[in-house]
């Protein structure tokens, strides 16, 4: 089956509230695997933090899965159902991300990395990982059946589940140096997803992906247009460009204080243009995305020094937070931000 018509996409979008939320990872997890693996699934923290999100006025979140979770399918599905029940109780509809080209390669199930002090997303895992992406690009296709099974079984299982808002099938294809080597896997994923054709819309971002062919492929196949924008100077020009496609638009990543895409700057622009929006990060925790991207350059040296944060240690803070909104104790980074968001959403 093909992508939705523009008319169907607009009809779906009109039936949603104005979408506002965060890219969500519980503060007790360092990555997607730690969030859902049975050994580390933290139902209490997820409940607490999604209650905070609902109280702030958020009605959606964006959450990443991982292909390796399908290797422990039975345990994962139990935890995913618990997660969906919590979301539903808080009137939050999750957008689910399936693949991702960002951060650490060579993902593995089991015990995950300890956080590295002051390093942005030091343990986030690519899915399926650049090594597999490169193999597929080079014509080595032995991983394709496993990946197809993950994509199609997830989409089929939840294809009529009204608790799920939307499927973001591949986050930022081409990022972290892989470039247009991701095009072959992305083509497969679009084909697999459209074969299932779930009742929810399908997307993969335009701005945020790397490579003209990749961006064009996402544009041609997405039911809903999605994009990422962290620099205030580019936000309105990106929106102007995307409005010409004449489909509903959602910004699935924004809010880097250092680059000016604060809530105070961004939310009025999104609301004026009827664009849903998901800032990066909610409660600062093991992923440490309240530290800036530049800290990633220190990752190898931090590993060499074994500069880890152990379970009994607190999370350090930069003077100015890059992403995220709250601390683990529930206190906000900036109460003025909280006041602004709540007043804006009244």
What annotation goes with each model-predicted range?
Residues 20-21, 248-252, 256-346:
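Substrate-binding cleft of secreted/luminal carbohydrate-active enzymes
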Residues 172-173, 229, 253-254:
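Active-site metal-binding loops of divalent metal-dependent hydrolases
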Residues 231-232, 257:
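Short acidic, S/G/P-rich loop/turn micro-motifs used as interaction or catalytic elements
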Residues 86, 241, 269:
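Hydrophobic/aromatic ligand-binding patch that stacks against planar heteroaromatic rings
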Residues 1-222, 236, 245, 258, ...:
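Active-site mouth of glycoside hydrolases
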Residues 63, 97, 227, 279-280:
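Short beta-strand and adjacent tight-turn residues that come in two discontinuous sequence segments
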Residues 205, 227, 250-253:
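Active-site neighborhood of phospho(di)ester-bond hydrolases with catalytic His/Asp-centered motifs
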């Amino acid at each position: 089956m093909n992508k939705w018509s523009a008319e169907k996409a607009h009809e779906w979008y009109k039936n949603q509230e104005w979408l506002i939320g965060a890219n969500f990872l519980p503060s007790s997890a360092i990555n997607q695997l730690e969030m859902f693996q049975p050994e580390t699934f933290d139902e209490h923290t997820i409940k607490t933090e999604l209650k905070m999100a609902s109280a702030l006025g958020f009605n959606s979140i964006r959450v990443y899965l991982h292909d390796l979770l399908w290797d422990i399918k039975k345990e994962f599905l139990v935890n995913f159902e618990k997660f969906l029940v919590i979301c539903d109780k808080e009137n939050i509809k999750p957008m689910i991300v399936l693949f991702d080209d960002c951060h650490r390669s060579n993902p593995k199930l089991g015990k995950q990395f300890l956080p590295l002090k002051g390093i942005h997303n030091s343990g986030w895992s690519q899915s399926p990982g650049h090594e597999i992406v490169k193999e597929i690009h080079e014509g080595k296709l032995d991983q394709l059946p496993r990946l197809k099974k993950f994509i199609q079984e997830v989409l089929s299982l939840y294809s009529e589940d009204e608790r799920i808002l939307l499927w973001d099938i591949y986050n930022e294809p081409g990022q972290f140096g892989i470039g247009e080597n991701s095009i072959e896997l992305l083509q497969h994923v679009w084909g697999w997803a459209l074969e299932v054709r779930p009742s929810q819309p399908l997307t993969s971002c335009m701005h945020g992906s790397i490579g003209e062919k990749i961006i064009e492929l996402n544009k041609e196949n997405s039911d809903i247009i999605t994009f990422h924008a962290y620099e205030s100077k580019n936000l309105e020009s990106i929106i102007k460009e995307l409005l010409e496609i004449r489909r509903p638009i959602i910004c699935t990543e924004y809010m880097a204080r250092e680059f000016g895409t604060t809530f105070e700057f961004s939310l009025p622009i999104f609301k004026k243009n009827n664009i849903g929006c998901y800032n990066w990060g909610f409660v600062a925790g093991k992923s440490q995305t309240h530290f800036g991207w530049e800290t990633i350059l220190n990752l190898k040296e931090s590993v060499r020094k074994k500069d880890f944060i152990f379970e009994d240690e607190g999370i350090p803070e930069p003077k100015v937070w890059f992403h995220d909104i709250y601390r683990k104790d529930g206190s906000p980074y900036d109460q003025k931000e909280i006041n602004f968001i709540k007043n804006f959403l009244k």
